[in-house]
Amino acid sequence: MKENEQYKDAEKRTMGTIEVREAEGEEMILEGYAAVFNSETDLGHFREVIKPGAFDDVMTNDVRALINHDPNLVLGRTKNGTLELSQDERGLKYRVKLGGQQYAKDFYESVKRGDISQSSFAFTIDKQSWNEERTVRSVDKVRQLLD
């Protein structure tokens, strides 16, 4: 499947905060929550809640951390261990070990200065439910976690 085809039905969400974690030596590490469970997000024409367990089926997928969903600006990848994903009671957590590319260094510095304070993720939905009365969509299962 071509890269653009993967994103054809993808939805993107901006969530939570992104933080700098300086580890031993010169490593550049960013971490935060891509999604927070049971928290309503106002998407304009409806609100959305991501349910615990929504990501259970995609945790072993090859997921990339990208700058602005651009496949040319890869910050990390689960396949090679530079992106780690985990779930806890709060949500879907990520930890990215950045490489030495100039764009990664620039991105890291922008987060460190506070110019960039949020992150987003792209996904497709497998199962959802609606509360029509309150116009709230619950994301019960994610089909693909793209970035």
Task: Give the ranges of each region predicted by the language model.
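Residue microenvironments linked to proteolytic maturation
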Residues: 21-24, 29-31, 64, 82-147
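Short, flexible beta-strand-to-coil junctions
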Residues: 35-39, 68-70, 124-126
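Polar/acidic, low-complexity leader/linker segments enriched in S/T/G and N/D
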Residues: 1-59
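A glycine-rich, hydrophobic loop/mini-helix early in the fold
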Residues: 52-96
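Short, surface-exposed beta-strand/loop "edge" segments at domain boundaries and coil↔beta transitions
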Residues: 37-43, 71-75, 102-105
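Flexible, active-site-adjacent loop/turn segments at secondary-structure boundaries
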Residues: 35, 53, 73, 137-140
